[in-house]
Amino acid sequence: AGGAHFFGQEGSRKVPEKGKEPATRSVLMAPTLHKAHQAAGRQTDDSAVVHFFKNMMSPKAPVQQKARSGASRAITKFIWGTDGQRPHYGASGSSKSREAYRGRKDGSGTLSSFFKMGKKGEGSPARR
């Protein structure tokens, strides 16, 4: 259970759903959120986000084991620095629209290249 691989998949596979607002919220999250907001809306959505971050930032740090060069650090910086710090309460408002276009552009292109670069340890140029 790592972080890097599902970033790639949800980045590119969830792009077609960018038009729907509930789907937009799950674009930068995991498929778990997709099921969550269907089942119980905001409530489960929130806990799924929390679970996602607990899993991501746990002391075991599955991400670091998977990509132990610069990627884990870059991933963390990317998540918390960009949209990760306000996915569950920002998605309803401002972050919704920008996630829509982020999903379209960054989904396949920048996001994947970001991880290729991040593994080499060049996280910052990819973030811009």
UniProtKB/Swiss-Prot annotation:
Mod. after translation: The N-terminus is blocked.
Cysteines paired by S-S bonds: none
Membrane topology: Peripheral membrane protein
Chain intervals for the UniProt region annotation (Disordered): 1-24, 82-128
Predominant place of localization: membrane
Compartments (UniProt record): Myelin membrane
Record's protein name: Myelin basic protein
Lineage of origin: Eukaryota, Metazoa, Chordata, Craniata, Vertebrata
Underlying gene: MBP
